[in-house]
Amino acid sequence: KKVYGDNTDYIGFAKTYQKLVKRRIDKILLIGAGGAARSILQFLNDEEINQIDIFTRSLNKKKTLSKSMRFDNFIIDSKELRNKRYDLIINASDAGMLGRKNLANNVYKLVSNTAYIIDIVYNPMRTKLIDIAKASNVPNDGGLGMLLEQAKPSFEAWFNTKISISQYLRSKLTSQLRYE
């Protein structure tokens, strides 16, 4: 017997990206190198983005990601982020999540010169990264959009029924999450 797996993070991120981004993106900073980052990186490769830098402090995840995706454009030290400019910054790490550390300060310093911010963290719904993006008038999307967009095809596959992401569903989920 064969077992097949599927991952809906790709779909969830693709829909989030397509709703937010309104112009050609050339330079991206992807923060994190775990499972969600892998799906996002695959989407970005499919979009033929010119430059993707991955910021991770985990040498093990760097090694795993570079081997599995044949990718080796990593930033390990946040000091390397100084004076960089990106069209899009994506936080695909657990940094900023409830009970976790925030991102490195050098990441926050990049926000005002960035066209778009996507933070896939959804608890709390407003992370420091999203707050800084809003204060800087940078178009952004928090993690709730991706959570709902990846949950939809997953639910449909498991229960063999179509659903829509209604305002009711969004507000029901929102009421369960924190806003810190």
Predicted regions and their residues:
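NAD(P)-binding Rossmann-fold cofactor-contacting core
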Residues: 49-69
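Adenosine-phosphate binding glycine-rich loop
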Residues: 116, 120-180
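Conserved S-adenosyl-L-methionine
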Residues: 46-51, 135-139
